[in-house]
Amino acid sequence: MNEKYSKKTYRLLFGAMTSVFVLAGAAGASAETLESALARAYGNNPDINAQRASVRATDETVPQAKSGYRPQINGTADVGRTYTEFDSGTPRTVFGGGTTTSRLTPRGFGVQIDQSLFDGYRTTNRVRAAESSVLGSRETLNTTEQSVLLDGATAYMDVLRDTAILDLQRNNVEVIDEQLRQTRDRFNVGEVTRTDVAQAEARLAAARSEASLAEATLRNSIAVYRQVIGVDPAQLAPGRPLDRLTPRNVDAALKVGLNEHPAIKARQHAVDVAELQVKIEQGALAPQLGVSGSVNQRYDRNQEGDNALSASVVAQLTVPIYEGGQVYAATRQAKETAGQRRLEADSVRDQVRAAIQSSWGRLEAARAQIQAAQAQIDAAETALNGVREEARVGQRTTLDVLNAQQELLNARVNLITAQRDRVVASYSLVNAMGRLNSRALGLKVNHYSPKIHYDQVKDLWIGLSTPDGR
C-alpha cells in the first residue's frame, strides 16, 4: 500500500472524526440554538395556541355560573287588531237594541325582573366548579407546553444527530471508494487478488446504501422539526443537557414530580369539579326562593282610548316533594363520576412516577454509553492503525482493513447517538418532573399568562367582544 493512499485515506478519516463532535462543538454566530428553536415553538406551535384558546373558552364558564346571582330582565311588547260584533236580539228601534260593532287596536309593553334569592347553593357551587375547571385547564396548558417543548428539543437533537451521521456515512463512502481505487491498482500489479477487489466493491455498495438510508432519516427528522418548531432547520448550534435542572438522585426527582407536575394538578382540579357537581345535583332537592317584579302598560284593551298601568311584586317559595327520581339518579351518577376522577388522579400519579424513573434510567444509560463509545473509538482507531500497518507488509487482507474501518464508523455513530440521547433524556426527565417550562428554560419570549384573560372576563355582565388576554 503506497504512501499516497495512506495520506489521502487519513485525511478522509480525520474529516469523519470532526462529525463525531458536532453535538458538543462551538456554535457559529448565526447558528440557531436549541433555546431559540424552543422559543419559536413556544410562540408559534398550533397545539400550544389551541390549548390557550381552550383555556380562554373555559374562563367564560365563570361568568356563566355567576349569572345565577344576577337578575333576569325581559321586556315585552305586543300589538293586535280586534273586531267585535254584538247583536242584542232586540229591534234596532228599541234603546240599546240592534247590532253594534267595535274595532280596536290593543297594544302594550312591559318589563319583568326575576331574581333568585336561594337555590340550594347551586349557583355558589357552580361558580366554585367553574373556577376549578379554569385552574385545571391552566394546568392542562402547562402540560401541553411541556410536551411541545420536549418534542421541540427531541426534533432539534434528531436533526443534529442525523446530520452528523449522514456526514459520517458520506465520508465513509469516500474512504471506501478511495480504497477500492487503490485496491484495483494493487490488483493490476498483482499485489492482491480479485477477491480483494470484490470485497471492496461490496463494501462500497453497502456504504452507499447506508448513506442513502441516513439521508432519508435526516429528511424525516427535518419534517418533524418543521412541524414542531414551525420553520425548516438551518445551521444548528450544539445542544446541551439540562444539568442545571436535573436533581442529584431519582428520589429528589420523584419528590418534585409528584408535588409539581401539572398533569397531577389538573386531575386534582377535576376531582374538585366532580365533587362540587355532587353538591350541585343535591341542591335541586332544596327549597327554591325567588322574587319577581313586573310593570305593564296597556292601551285600547276593552274600548278605544282606555289605558291601564299595572305593577306587581311576587315572592315565590318552591319546595320540591317528588320529581320522579331524576335528581336522585343524577346525584348518584355524580358520585360515581367523582370516584372515577379520583382513580384517574391516582393513575396519573403512577404515570408520572414511572416516567421519572424511566427518564432517569435513560439519562444514566446515555452517560455510560458516551463513556463507552469514546473508549470504543479510541480502541477502534488503534486497531485500524495496526491493521493498516500490518496490511502494508501483507499480514492483513483488504477485508481486515474494511472491517476495522467499519468498527470505527460504528463507534463514531454510537457516540453521536449517545450524545443525542443524553440531551433528550435530560429534557425528558425535567418534563417528567413537571418543570420543562419557558421560564425554567430561560426562553426569551413573552410568557403567556392565562390570568390576564380570566381577570378581563370573570365579572363581565354584558359584552360580545372577546378580550385578547394581553
Question: Where do the PLM segments sit?
Answer:
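Small/polar (Gly/Ser/Thr/Ala-rich) solvent-exposed segments
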Residues: N49, Q72-R92, T99-L104, D114-T143, ...
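Periplasmic alpha-helical coiled-coil/stalk elements that build and connect Gram-negative outer-membrane
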Residues: N2-R11, S147-L258, R362, A366, ...
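Amphipathic alpha-helical coiled-coil segments
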Residues: A50-A65, T144, V148-L168, E178, ...
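Acidic, low-complexity, intrinsically disordered peripheral segments
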Residues: N2-K8, Y83, T417-R470
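Bacterial Sec-pathway N-terminal export signals of envelope proteins
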Residues: A29-D78, T84, S116, P233-D272, ...
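Gram-negative bacterial Sec-dependent N-terminal signal peptides
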Residues: M1-S30
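Transmembrane beta-barrel architecture of outer-membrane proteins
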Residues: T33-S36, P106-G108, T154, Q199, ...
